[in-house]
Amino acid sequence: KLENPSNFFRIRYAGNIPQEADVLVYYKTSPVGSTLDFDRINWTLSDPDYAIVKVQNGDDTFIDVDYSEEGLSQFDVIAVKIVMQSTNSSAIPRIRDLRIIACA
């Protein structure tokens, strides 16, 4: 639970995402004071702030990827789900340096 409610958040990670792969970022928030079971809140797909730069398989370059959601209802609980997928089992996406920032 957040100490201060927020209506904005940013997700950033360094990604190594081959051409055959993709990373999907989902989030869900709970409004301030909500008594709704958090597990019953639906996940929302977040779009990256700009096109994700993909790398050639075997390239160890990591590139920063940002997601921002603004103008949300005030929330004090947030969950993030990252789905990494690929059509080639030898070209899998990798992420590191994950940061999730909720701003008051």
Short names for language-model regions:
Residues 1-104:
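Beta-strand-rich ligand- or partner-binding modules
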